UniProtKB/Swiss-Prot annotation:
Cellular compartments per GO CC: cytosolic large ribosomal subunit
Protein's UniProt name: Large ribosomal subunit protein eL31
InterPro entries: Ribosomal_eL31, Ribosomal_eL31_CS, Ribosomal_eL31_dom_sf
One family name in Pfam for this protein: Ribosomal_L31e
Domain of life the protein comes from: Archaea
Family: Belongs to the eukaryotic ribosomal protein eL31 family.
Length: 83
């Protein structure tokens, strides 16, 4: 059964709790952990557009939040950016 949802993932916590040189990698990790928790799956595949959005303004200026569309097919969760 295929399940589809749209989430707004807050990244403000990552900004406030991380040094500037580690924000983008920690933001990607936070997105992955958020989706693992909310979709109840260990296998999370992030689309390249999400990575480009987080890294768009360099390492230390990540967006405050990201909207993603998530599709769960079996045990695999695939996430893409909502424009």
């Amino acid at each position: 059964m295929e399940e589809e949802r749209i989430y707004t993932i807050p990244l403000r916590d990552v900004t406030n709790k991380s040094p500037t040189t580690k924000r983008a990698p920690r933001a990607i990790r936070a997105i992955r952990e958020f989706l693992k928790k909310h979709m109840k799956s260990d296998i999370v595949k992030l689309d390249n557009t999400i990575n480009e959005k987080v890294w768009e303004r360099s390492l230390n200026k990540i967006p405050a939040k990201v909207r993603v569309k998530v599709v769960k097919e079996g045990d695999v969760v695939k996430a893409t950016l909502v424009e």
